[in-house]
Amino acid sequence: MKKLLPDLIAILAFVLLSFAYFFPADIENRILFQHDTAAGAGAGQEVKEYYEQTGERSRWTNSLFGGMPMYQIAPSYDSTKSLQWVQKAYQLFLPDYVCLTFMLMLGFYILLRVFGIPVWLAGLGGIMWAFSSYFFILISAGHIWKFITLAYVPPTIAGIAVSYT
């Protein structure tokens, strides 16, 4: 346990820093308008109504581009429900914006620790990675899928590196 203490302190610092950054928004229950998220909800409305009427999930919508598969807009498969719990655990069940920033810091921290970087430098690297401007541009635009994909790149590389060592 004593060996893990510095890593646990770094993770706790990531949580506190994420909460501190979004503190005004969390306290006042503000919601950031994200155009692509709103547009995606509108695009999926037809399929949502179909599900409410029939109880069946449609895999196609006519509301975009004369027809489009739903897996690109709002995928919902029974097989992914078990993975949602794993994702929430990785996010420490934190609120939306807080968990996004936390995921970036934690993922890059894991990568740097796998490569043998000391805790304090890995923590600093995670913070620098997370607070680069592009990620906040993605959040404000509503490009959450792209954001989450980029958040999972560093721990994925770390997993690959660990599997070959």
Where are the regions a protein language model picked out?
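Conserved small/polar residues in nucleotide/adenosyl-binding loops
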Residues: Y164-T165
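Membrane-interface coil-to-helix junctions
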Residues: L17-L111, F115, I127-P154
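Start-transfer (signal-anchor) and selected internal transmembrane alpha helices
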Residues: M1-F23
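Alpha-helical transmembrane segments of integral membrane proteins
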Residues: L5-A13, W120-L124, T149
